[in-house]
Amino acid sequence: GVEIEENSELDLFEAFNKHEGDERIPAIVKEMEEELGAGNKKPEILPKLAQYELTLKDWVRDHKGYRKYVTLTGKCWPAFQTQFGFVPCYVNSRLTAQGIPVSCEVDIYGTLSEFIGQVVSDDIVTLLDINNSVPKDMYKESIEGKFNYTLQDTFMGFHCGNTDRKSTRLNSSHRL
């Protein structure tokens, strides 16, 4: 069966703050710098991202208990950016690459689906929401005349940047 442990953003924020100055942060930052290379668009936030990654990994370790598998589902907006000072997409991508499926928007079913896909395929899985409402101005600016697609042929694949780095060009904005 599936068990869900619910924790508030405040619990997460408290755990995050307790990791401030953690001696493991510099090693994670170095790993991120090497991984991102030229895609490191915001080097100044890497220490906070490393702090957040350690927070989540320690959270998993401390809450896993007898369970064999763990997934994470978070809420990354609207207060996340203002309170934590960053968006979690890159860290979520890294955790997904390490075999811990992560979804945003409190998408519990999506996280479970990613986990099932991972077990079935023995590979990292990303689910993207298909949104058929590509704005006309975006179509005109980015697609029309450049590619042989009509507006009706286009869609948006979206899921907050949790796509594993092997699936896209790696940079810290981390969007497909």
Language-model-detected regions and their locations in the chain:
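Surface-exposed, flexible loop/turn segments at secondary-structure boundaries
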Residues: L12, F80, L176
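Single conserved hydrophobic/aromatic residue that forms the stacking wall/gate
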Residues: L170-L176
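Metallocofactor- and cofactor-centric catalytic cores in central/energy metabolism, strongly enriched
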Residues: V2-T71
